[in-house]
Amino acid sequence: MKRGKVSDTILDRSVFKLLGRRGNTSKPAYGQDAAHIYSQGWDTLAAAATGSLAVYRAVNNISAAGGAADCIMNTIIIDEKSREIRLKEIIKELDRQCQVVGVGIAGGHTTVCPNVNRPVVSVTAIGHKLRTHQKAVAGQDIVMTKHIGMSGIRTVISHKRDEILNDLPEDVINKAFAADEELIIAKEAQIFIKQNIDGAMHDASEGGIFAALWDMAEYSGTGLDIDLRHISVKQEIIEICELFNINPYILDSMGCLLMTCENGCDIVNIMKQNGIEAAVIGKITDGNNRIIHNTEEDRYLGLPEQDEIYRFI
């Protein structure tokens, strides 16, 4: 299998079809990155993520599901060659990310395993529900916050900084490299929730904005009509992407939130009043056609592709 998220086909064939439904939990589904657990009057959300920014990913999943994160649990698998100082570095980084999003580490599991060649970190965020997770409905506008490719380009810069500096000034790197706070969607998600309007939310992450749009439509059972020209990407990110022939639309885009609602312009204005860039990028449509419009051509959105970051890690 390819590195990264497994395909929808594999998920359906080898995961979802084998799962029974037990207890008071939501059923796993495409585009649903957080589980809803209802027990004795408590509405709890749980979301898992892996990787160097796992805390942010897991907490973002809780936010996009209409909740607020309260704490995280972590699992750390260390290879036999790693020294104790490496474990300390991992814990310090997890704690630093927790400080950024305002949650604590409630517990976890740490083990040394001979079957890995580098540390593996998995995070599960646990939170409470602020509203019911909704599906998108035909006729709604699609609003996107911030810019695509922010988290992915951080990875590229981390691995290719010297090569980038051979062709581009350091100022380009500085402007392309997103601050940690830019990768968090909790603020805009809670602003959207407070409007008390019908609409879906989905955070972009691995697979980029194209994967996020596909997942949202697949979960909702709808089509899409997207204007590519309205999807915001920083010029500095474009310049770095061009150096390595990267497609920014399938590049990890953590920090970007998709929302659907009847009047997208109203949400855009509210976001901008709160210091968050946003734009209407298209509409939810009936049927299964998922169309991307560009200046030169129209195309159908296909199944999510492997994220471009796997060319660099």
Mark where each language-model region is.
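Acidic, Ser/Thr/Pro-rich beta/coil linker or hinge segments at domain junctions
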Residues: K2-L11, K272-I313
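Beta-strand->loop->alpha-helix junctions that form or flank phosphate-binding loops
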Residues: S26-A29, A204-S205, G223-S232, I250-D252, ...
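Solvent-exposed alpha-helices and their adjacent loops that cap or buttress functional pockets
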Residues: K27-A29, I37-S39, C98, C113-R118, ...
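Active-site-proximal betaalpha loop/short-helix elements
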Residues: D79-K81, F177-S253
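A short beta-alpha structural unit
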Residues: M254-T260
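Helix N-cap motif at beta-to-alpha junctions
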Residues: T260-D266
